[in-house]
A protein has these predicted regions:
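Short, small-residue-biased leader/transition segments that mark boundaries at the very start
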Residues: 1-4
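Active-site environment of divalent metal-dependent phosphoester hydrolases
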Residues: 43-47, 66-68, 129-134, 166-169
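A structural signal for short, well-ordered beta-strand segments and their strand-loop junctions
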Residues: 87, 123-127, 157-162
Length: 179
């Protein structure tokens, strides 16, 4: 397991500059064949946790919410699941309001391009276009990853996290499933 925080920690990340090939090389991603890109630490567990048990994932979080607890939980998840991870430092909130990443999209795209083209990924996984339950960062992550994935690849190995359902509609959803 490896993650990066500009120090030999379990998770790589916490940065003010762009992701570099040299930095990705330092993570020794040879055993990682799958890429998971999420908006926040804990999204990898909530939306993609079962997949992490398969190992071989490089998990990238776009923001940590400047939250030490979430960083530590991410590090522990990556360590315990035997995967590798990177936390970037794009803003979660600005002046108490959720950031729309307006001034950061070009930088996010540059980082996504570096990561997506770093090596051949057998699978790329991210938030679904609806942002699971409509979270703006999940929606934007999905949109940016999808855009850059198809700009760089001509294949269909991009996958989205499943649909989120509110508790009150679960019986209706369950009744629509095949037995």
């Amino acid at each position: 397991y490896t993650t990066l925080f500009r120090s030999p920690a379990y998770v790589t990340g916490i940065r003010s500059s762009h992701v570099t090939v040299k930095e990705l090389d330092s993570l020794q991603l040879e055993d990682c064949t799958k890429l998971m890109i999420v908006a926040h630490p804990d999204d990898e567990t909530i939306w993609g946790g079962a997949h992490l048990a398969d190992k071989g994932y490089f998990v990238v979080c776009l923001t940590d919410g400047y939250n030490k607890t979430r960083r530590n939980e991410f590090q522990n998840t990556i360590k315990e699941s035997g995967n590798k991870g990177l936390i970037l430092r794009y803003p979660d909130k600005v002046h108490g309001e959720r950031s729309n990443w307006a001034g950061d999209k070009k930088d996010i795209i540059k980082d996504l391009d570096t990561i997506l083209t770093y090596k051949h990924w057998n699978m790329v996984v991210t938030h679904n276009p609806e942002g699971e339950y409509g979270h703006i960062h999940h929606e934007m992550t999905s949109q940016l990853v999808t855009q850059e994935y198809y700009r760089n690849y001509q294949k269909n190995d991009l996958y989205y996290f499943g649909q989120y359902y509110k508790k009150k509609v679960l019986p209706e959803v369950e009744s629509s499933l095949r037995s």
